[in-house]
């Protein structure tokens, strides 16, 4: 009897640690995991393409301007439109309409605009003359003259915040109780983020000189072929996402076993108007702290990424070589996320919310400072380790920046994302939907655009400045933002305890 009891105890502990999903819950767990996998699959293909196109075709410096003057206004407009849509359309229809809009735009760019970019854009010589004539406004001139790249970049930048952070997690939070979230969310992250590894291998092949595409079609321009094939894959996976949303809406939302408790609470909720809704959100200290946390990540990581991506372009100057390196980085990011998800799953169950949530800002701050120190004091460090470092200063900077970003994204997309989503579960429907839309879409873009604003002001005032030359300033700002993030995490933990 004792042996049987001990065996059951061990089995229960093993299951709780590695597979805390009951068999009857698989009908909910598997479709949601598949949806997350597909959304992140597309997200990372678009991430590789948008950076490879914008930075290789124009420059790394232009990205900050695009985030401030293009991405942020579009994100703000989307939140207003979304708040209107949610009062008149079902979630399912909203997902379909937004998917159709984004995929149509990506297809238009890949098959019409990009192959004929010389028709749609200002001639490079004319653009160069204007930029030389007005050096303080050269980046703004470049924004307008290269509008096709900017629009594509802006839409690809919005994809993660709209389809993953907002729509997917809103959908999932609606279906999941707090008790289920503690067991499911890290596993969602584990399965969903495994898509990064697949995307990494796929895009490395598509962007390489020996791509498998050559076996099926003749390639006249490798970068255009890369974008067109990748966009076709994105469109197919987007259709699969729509089918999964349809399946979940039809078979899970209507199943009392999966949705009865939440459905009952929803029936008593009244919708507020747009103006009243935003006034309600503005009064929430809880959401303001959430906004600071999300904005801080976007701000901090964008400062490091901007310098790192400028170094990548120096080492890999073409669209395809940049994309190939980016694919390798995405692959290892996927590996890091899976490892940290397993660690985070146990941290979240064994410790309180604060311990799990503070891991991300601490790791990002420490690794980010190390990267900036290498950039700012590169010559001193190389002379100190003369002969011991078997690579060029440029290759070393790209490698260290890659490690920093892999660790930062690994902790963010595994531990921090799941910790943040738990904060929405105790909230009422209005804050879960419109509040989440405002925080998740706007805050991330405020963070990135604020970072971009700092960069754009410097590059406007000092036209000849480069990311390397302004790195000391960026390092100081980066450190301050990370400390603010840690402070906000501590404050919101106290608020979270009050309502759970």
Swiss-Prot record:
Keywords: ATP-binding, Cell membrane, Membrane, Nucleotide-binding, Transmembrane, Transmembrane helix, Transport. The chain crosses the membrane at residues 26-46, 62-82, 94-114, 149-169, 184-204, 224-244, 287-307, 328-348, 357-377, 381-401, 469-489. It is a multi-pass membrane protein. GO terms for molecular function: ATP binding; ATP:ADP antiporter activity. Its main location: membrane. The keyword ATP-binding applies. It comes from the Bacteria. It is found in: Cell membrane. The keyword NADP does not apply. One of its GO terms (cellular component) is plasma membrane. InterPro entries: ADP_ATP_car_bac_type. Belongs to the ADP/ATP translocase tlc family. Provides the rickettsial cell with host ATP in exchange for rickettsial ADP. This is an obligate exchange system. This energy acquiring activity is an important component of rickettsial parasitism. NCBIfam families: AAA. PANTHER family: ADP,ATP CARRIER PROTEIN 1, PTHR31187. This is ADP,ATP carrier protein 5.
């Amino acid at each position: 009897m004792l042996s049987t009891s001990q065996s059951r105890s061990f089995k229960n502990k093993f299951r709780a640690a590695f597979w805390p999903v009951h068999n009857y819950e698989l009908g909910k767990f598997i479709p949601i995991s598949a949806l997350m996998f597909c959304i992140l699959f597309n997200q990372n293909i678009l991430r590789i393409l948008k950076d490879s196109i914008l930075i290789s075709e124009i420059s790394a410096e232009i990205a900050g301007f695009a985030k401030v003057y293009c991405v942020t206004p579009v994100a703000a407009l989307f939140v207003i439109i979304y708040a209107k849509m949610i009062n008149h359309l079902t979630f399912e229809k909203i997902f379909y309409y937004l998917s159709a809009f984004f995929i149509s735009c990506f297809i238009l760019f890949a098959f019409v605009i990009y192959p004929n970019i010389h028709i749609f854009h200002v001639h490079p010589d004319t653009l160069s003359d204007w930029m030389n004539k007005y050096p303080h406004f050269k980046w703004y001139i470049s924004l307008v003259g290269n509008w096709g790249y900017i629009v594509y970049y802006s839409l690809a930048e919005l994809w993660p915040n709209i389809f993953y952070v907002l729509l997917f997690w809103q959908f999932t939070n609606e279906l999941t109780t707090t008790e289920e979230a503690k067991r499911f969310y890290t596993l969602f992250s584990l399965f969903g983020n495994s898509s990064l590894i697949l995307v990494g291998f796929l895009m490395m092949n598509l962007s390489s000189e020996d791509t498998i595409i050559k076996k099926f079609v003749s390639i006249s321009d490798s970068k255009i072929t890369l974008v067109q094939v990748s966009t076709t894959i994105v469109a197919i996976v987007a259709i699969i996402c729509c089918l999964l949303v349809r399946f979940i809406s039809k078979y899970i939302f209507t199943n009392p076993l999966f949705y009865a408790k939440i459905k009952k609470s929803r029936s008593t909720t009244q919708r507020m108007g747009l103006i009243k809704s935003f006034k309600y959100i503005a009064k929430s200290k809880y959401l303001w702290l959430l906004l600071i946390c999300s904005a801080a990540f976007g701000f901090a990581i964008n400062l490091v990424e901007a310098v790192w991506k400028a170094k990548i372009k120096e080492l890999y100057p073409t669209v395809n070589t940049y994309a190939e390196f980016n694919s390798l980085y995405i692959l290892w990011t996927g590996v890091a996320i899976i490892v940290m998800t397993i660690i985070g799953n146990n941290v979240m169950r064994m410790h309180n919310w604060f311990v799990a949530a503070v891991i991300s800002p601490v790791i990002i701050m420490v690794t980010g400072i190390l990267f900036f120190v290498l950039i700012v004091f590169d010559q001193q460090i190389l002379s100190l380790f003369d002969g011991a470092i078997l690579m060029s200063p440029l290759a070393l900077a790209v490698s260290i920046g890659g490690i920093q970003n892999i660790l930062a994204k690994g902790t963010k997309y595994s531990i921090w994302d799941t910790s943040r989503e738990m904060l929405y579960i105790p909230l009422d429907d209005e804050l879960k939907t419109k509040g989440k839309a405002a925080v998740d879409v706007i805050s991330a873009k405020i963070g990135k655009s604020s970072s971009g604003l700092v960069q754009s002001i410097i590059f406007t005032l000092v036209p000849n400045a480069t990311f390397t030359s302004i790195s000391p300033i960026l390092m100081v700002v980066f450190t301050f933002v990370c400390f603010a993030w840690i402070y906000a995490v501590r404050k919101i933990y106290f608020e979270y305890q009050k309502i759970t």
